[in-house]
Amino acid sequence: GTVWLNIGDCYAGYSGNTGGATGSDLRGTRNTTVVKTGSNLKKRDLVGVPWVAAFALREAGWYLRCDIVWAKPNPIPESVKNRPTRSHEFIFLLSKNPQYYYNMDAIREPLAKPVGKKVNSRGERLIVGNPKGKNSRDVWWIAPKPIRGSHIAVFPLDLPKKCILAG
């Protein structure tokens, strides 16, 4: 079997005086983790939580099979002025064994051109393209579907569905 892991990342910060700001006045403190003394992280460093977790799982015996970029066409706005707005997360495909079930046909993507015939340089006719579609790529463009009255960060159901179908 497989495990599909999605963990959000955060930025390093420091605990301490917030200048009297509270609640929603703490701009930029969302997705922030406190830096411990002696850490090699600096304030405002991207921590890399997904990769730290993936490498720790690999050290624990898991096979790190693939990193998939979940590209978000409509990400949550960020009020940052010193870096681009984050519009992706990582999904890691892991397995406990080198041989595992993976159903590539279940998540194939449509072909740009229909399956057809082509003539090669020797005049032989070849069938081009898999009629089931092309193999899934490692960048998945999946947007959440808005739900009235719901939380702003709606998790798209198509994301776990694709993982479940594949493995």
Predicted segment positions?
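Core catalytic lobe of class I
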Residues: G1-G167
